[in-house]
Regions:
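Metallocarboxypeptidase
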Residues: 1-228
């Protein structure tokens, strides 16, 4: 209701975690973006990657699909191992970019806010998967668990992964407790939070500056009497 009653809303960003990815519509194979809208999304996504330092900008439907994909489909923007932004034929129009890809193999997110904001209200909507833990050291398009472990040891002082240790559980008996800690793996640790916030705020301001700037070109007045105009 709030959005419906505020047609002045022109842009939105929602923040999720994690992955270091800028997401945009479409989220389903049936949805196609007009070329003019896609150009705008691609242009802002590229600028967003530059300020956030994230590695990928993609539609929701394309993200990491099919399984094991290197995220090199049409309409995706990817940061290379040298830090440059590479675009993959951005004006395809959205939807199913993989040709023979079957619908059941794809990530179709029906009922998502991104598509709703865009299609129902004409709002330029992004969703950012903030914070990427680890680096794609072998440039295969994904950050593996071994790469994350290496990153934790070399960059995070081994603070994010807890070694598996035996524990006598009152109900389950002998178990092991350990693995990735939620804070640090899915969300940045406090020393890294400020930088993460600042980069995302810069992308928000960048998007806001790209919206139309309204001006009043002419004002007419009509006297209605009793000092009322």
């Amino acid at each position: 209701d709030f959005i419906y009653n505020h047609p002045n809303i022109a842009a939105s960003q929602s923040l999720h975690s994690s992955g270091g990815v800028i997401l945009r519509p479409p989220s389903v194979p049936e949805m196609k973006l007009p070329s003019s809208d896609l150009r705008l999304y691609i242009a802002l996504s590229e600028r967003g990657l530059n300020v956030t330092k994230y590695g990928l900008a993609t539609s929701v439907y394309q993200w990491n699909w099919p399984r094991g994909s290197r995220n090199s489909g049409k309409g995706q923007l990817k940061r290379t191992d040298k830090g440059k932004i590479k675009g993959m034929d951005p004006f395809d129009g959205g939807g199913n970019h993989y040709g023979q890809l079957m619908e059941e193999d794809a990530y179709a997110a029906y009922g998502g806010s991104l598509d709703g904001l865009y299609e129902l209200f004409g709002i330029l909507a992004f969703a950012n998967e903030i914070y990427r833990f680890g680096d794609d050291l072998d440039n295969d398009g994904r950050v593996s668990a071994s790469e994350q472990l290496k990153y934790d040891d070399e960059q995070m002082g081994s603070k994010v992964f807890k070694d598996w240790t035996p524990y006598d559980h009152p109900t389950l008996g002998k178990v092991e407790i350990g693995g990735w800690k939620k804070f640090g793996h899915n969300n940045p640790l406090p020393p890294y939070l400020k930088d993460e916030i600042e980069r995302n705020v810069e992308f928000m301001l960048l998007q806001a500056r790209a919206t139309p700037l309204l001006t009043i070109s002419k004002v007419d007045q009509e006297y209605l009497g009793k000092n009322i105009y």
